[in-house]
Amino acid sequence: MKIISDNKRGMHNYKVIDKYEAGISLMGWEVKSARANTVSLLNSYCFFRKGEIFLCNAQFKQYMLVKCDETRDRKLLMHKNEIVRLQSKLHKLGHATIIPSKIYFDNRSRIKIEIALVQGMKKTDKREEIKKRDNERYIKKVLKNVY
C-alpha cells in the first residue's frame, strides 16, 4: 500500500468515530496526477447527493497541459448498504461530518480513499489528548529504562 496523500491537519481537529474504505471515480489525467503524488486533501469533505456519496474540494494538480477543474466533485464508489449505514450514523450523531483521511494505492494498484466519520473537538479535548499522549510516552520511557 503506497500512500499518495494524508490529511493529518484535518484529522487533528476531529475525533474519529468510524473509518471506511471507498473507491474513487477519476479521469485519466487525475490518475496520472495521483501517480505523481500531487494530490491535496486539505479542506476536503464528503457529502451525499441522491443516494450517492461525493468528495468535494480535493485538489488534483493539473497534469501537463490538461485544462480541467482541479477541485471538481468526485464520486466515491461504495456498496449501497455501506452508504445507507454511513448516512444513518451521520444523522444519528447530529454534529458530525465525513472527511477523507488518506488516499492511497492498494495492492492491485487501484486508487482507494479512506474516509472517516468524525465529530469536532473542542480545545479542552485537544489539550486532554495531548496530555494523555505525553503521559503514555513518559511511561514507555520509564519502562524501557527499567527493563
Curated annotation (Swiss-Prot):
The keyword Transport does not apply. One of its GO terms (biological process) is trans-translation. Keywords: Cytoplasm, RNA-binding. One of its GO terms (molecular function) is RNA binding. InterPro entries: SmpB, SsrA-bd_prot, SsrA-bd_prot_CS. Belongs to the SmpB family. Required for rescue of stalled ribosomes mediated by trans-translation. Binds to transfer-messenger RNA (tmRNA), required for stable association of tmRNA with ribosomes. tmRNA and SmpB together mimic tRNA shape, replacing the anticodon stem-loop with SmpB. tmRNA is encoded by the ssrA gene; the 2 termini fold to resemble tRNA(Ala) and it encodes a 'tag peptide', a short internal open reading frame. During trans-translation Ala-aminoacylated tmRNA acts like a tRNA, entering the A-site of stalled ribosomes, displacing the stalled mRNA. This is SsrA-binding protein. The gene is smpB.
